[in-house]
Curated annotation (Swiss-Prot):
Keyword Cytoplasm: no
Keyword Ribonucleoprotein in record: yes
Full protein name: Large ribosomal subunit protein uL5
HAMAP family on file: Ribosomal_uL5_B
GO MF, any single term: structural constituent of ribosome
GO CC term, one of those recorded: ribosome
């Protein structure tokens, strides 16, 4: 079991119960899933770019990504409905906890000119979204084998009802939020 999951069960649940006055531990917010999304708009002209992006995503997450397709045709972007234009991975359970641990402890500190994560990037329901500009911050990516630096979106879905609860949950995991 991941260290972060043990820490959640032993310390975070008690801490949040006291802070928000929950009556049962089932009311305490928890992380339900982490979604990684990588849009590869250039894949229209070169299919190899999407394969490389999917390989990077698989290395980062430890799971085979789902290829996302365009929902509708857009003439301005020269895409048609059904064209493969990106990939995504949904992490739950043990893989989710391991990824979160690597994200907080290893990857986020490797971001260039890092001054903390935006504490206002919550969606109103306690879910947190962040963007990463370079996939090379993850230790699983070999810098020499990268064909192109790509960014990805990371969404952390929680069972929190408010942004305040979600922020307290992530802050309990020592997320480096900007002051």
């Amino acid at each position: 079991m991941a260290k972060l999951h043990d820490y959640y069960k032993s310390d975070v649940v008690n801490e949040l119960s006291k802070q928000f006055g929950y009556k049962t531990i089932m009311q305490v917010p928890r992380i339900e899933k982490i979604t990684l999304n990588m849009g590869v708009g250039e894949a229209i002209s070169d299919k190899k770019l999407l394969e490389n992006a999917a390989a990077d995503m698989a290395a980062i997450s430890g799971q085979k990504p789902l290829i996302t397709k365009a929902r509708k045709s857009v003439a301005g972007f020269k895409i048609r409905e059904g064209y493969p234009i990106g990939c995504k991975v949904t992490l739950r359970g043990e893989r989710m906890w391991e990824f979160l641990e690597r994200l907080i402890c290893i990857s986020v500190p490797r971001i260039r000119d890092f001054r903390g994560l935006n504490a206002k990037a919550f969606d109103g329901r306690g879910n947190y979204s962040m963007g990463v500009r370079e996939q090379i911050i993850f230790p699983e990516i070999d810098y020499d084998k990268v064909d192109r630096v790509r960014g990805l979106d990371i969404t952390i879905t929680t069972s929190a009802n408010t942004d305040e609860e979600g922020r307290a949950l992530l802050a309990a995991f020592n997320f480096p939020f900007r002051k």
